[in-house]
Amino acid sequence: PKPKVTSREDAFIHAMPAYLGGSDRIGLKWVAGYEQNYAKGLPYIYGVMIMNDPETGRPVALLDGGWITEMRTPGVSGVTMRHVPGDPKHLAIVGCGLQGHRHLEVALEVHPGLTHVTAYDRNQGRAQEMLSLAGDRVTRAASSPTDAVSGADLVITTITVPLDPKLDCSNTDPNALLLP
């Protein structure tokens, strides 16, 4: 588990230290997620990465963790999608912020045969905006997370706060790939 601290009930800060022995690199990703930022017109997630000299511990770089997260997270999902057998036709995405957009791009690149894209976001405008990027595929903005995943054989959730009620995936395709 990631080390976590909180200053508010609907917020988190995670520390993710790492050392890569083969390349002798050491650093830390520090990510904050604050649900109440939506109402303030601010990004939900902020992050930085600090790289240190492995010999002395001296900080040598401070990097924008937001951009790195924006690219890395859907990249990992893309590798998973590429190596799971099958040719999905119906993609469902729950959460249509920046991660939802990037995951849509990756899913369409890895699985160009997708014919349907369903999306849910509590902000229906964001769902519609993201769906406009799906090209000539059949698209639908869902009324709930459970509605979004109905019949899907590829499900991606990009939310970091718990859904209430919990997401029920029992109505997905029995062979669906679920990427939380």
Language-model segments: what does each one mean?
Residues 100-101:
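N-terminal Rossmann-fold NAD(P) dinucleotide-binding loop
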Residues 110-134:
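NAD(P)-binding Rossmann-fold cofactor-contacting core
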Residues 84-90, 113, 173:
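Short helix-loop-beta connector
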Residues 159-161:
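Short glycine-/small-residue-rich Rossmann-like dinucleotide-binding loops
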Residues 1-70, 78:
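N-terminal ligand-binding/catalytic initiation module
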Residues 95-97:
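Glycine-rich Rossmann-fold phosphate-binding loop(s) that bind the pyrophosphate
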Residues 137-152, 167-169:
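Short acidic low-complexity segments
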Residues 171-180:
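ADP-ribose/adenylate-binding Rossmann-like module
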